[in-house]
Amino acid sequence: MKKFSEIKLQVISILSEIRPEYDFSQDLNFIEEGMLDSLDMVTLVAGLDEKYSISIDGDDIIPENFSSLDLVVNLLKKKGVKI
């Protein structure tokens, strides 16, 4: 089982590859701040699917699941990633 903080760091790493100009470790709303758009969310999903061997459905690709680091980690937990 991975620690919550370790998962957060891995998600930050994936996000930083997608949008290196932003600091995703901040407690901000990524969507409202313009840090992620819909294409970025799809790219993030592909990275998360590959990293954690999970499948995030299209129905889950909504701003409510990707607007903060904690929400992304919670989605991973719902998809079966052991945290």
Go through the PLM ranges and name each one.
Residues 60-71:
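AMP-binding/adenylate-forming catalytic domain of the ANL superfamily
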Residues 16-35, 54-62, 83:
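Phosphopantetheine carrier-protein modules
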Residues 42:
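Conserved catalytic core of two-component sensor histidine kinases
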Residues 1-23, 74-83:
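Thiotemplate assembly-line natural product biosynthesis machinery
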